[in-house]
């Protein structure tokens, strides 16, 4: 590997660490909030944090970050939060994709739907464990998306720019969902 490629890989690794730190902070705050509700809420928010931080290259957030920086942007702290929000949207789409594909593994780890299907079956509940796991997965995915939108809406960037970005993001999600792949 040449030195420029090594440099790029190293820069991406440093960036990933920054995004993961912010992702962890965002999700820790949500886990703390979930403590006001049920243990199950805490558990699935913790599971959301775990799947958000496991592997992944953080390419989508890096595109946001480096586009901003190359365009002259200087607010490092805020753009890292925005990049983390974009990763959360990606996680939301992966959780939904796992549900739609009836997947049991993602990146070598159990999916949300599989984790909670197994939890339900282990606890000997009488109703359908697959349905329970899928229900939790859909809810966790939607929560993830809304956390991302909260991060975007609460950023210190110009509200009109945020509005445009959220609309563009939503349009991309709609297009992806309407195509059904």
Segments (PLM) and residue ranges:
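All-alpha helical catalytic cores of prenyl diphosphate-utilizing isoprenoid enzymes
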Residues: 24, 28-38, 51-61, 135-147, ...
């Amino acid at each position: 590997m040449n030195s420029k490629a090594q440099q790029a890989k190293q820069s991406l690794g440093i960036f990933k660490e920054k995004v993961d730190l912010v992702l962890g902070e965002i999700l820790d705050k949500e886990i703390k909030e979930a403590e006001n509700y049920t243990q199950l809420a805490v558990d699935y928010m913790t599971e959301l944090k775990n799947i958000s931080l496991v592997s992944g290259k953080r390419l989508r957030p890096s595109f946001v970050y480096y586009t901003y920086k190359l365009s002259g942007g200087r607010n490092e702290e805020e753009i890292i939060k925005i990049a983390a929000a974009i990763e959360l949207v990606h996680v939301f789409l992966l959780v939904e994709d796992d549900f739609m594909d009836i997947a049991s593994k993602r990146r070598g780890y159990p999916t949300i739907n599989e984790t909670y299907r197994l939890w339900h079956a282990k606890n000997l509940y009488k109703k359908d464990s697959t349905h329970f796991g899928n229900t939790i997965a859909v809810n966790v995915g939607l929560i993830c998306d809304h956390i991302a939108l909260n991060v975007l809406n609460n950023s210190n960037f110009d509200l009109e720019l945020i509005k445009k970005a959220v609309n563009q993001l939503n349009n991309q999600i709609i297009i992806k969902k309407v195509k059904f792949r």
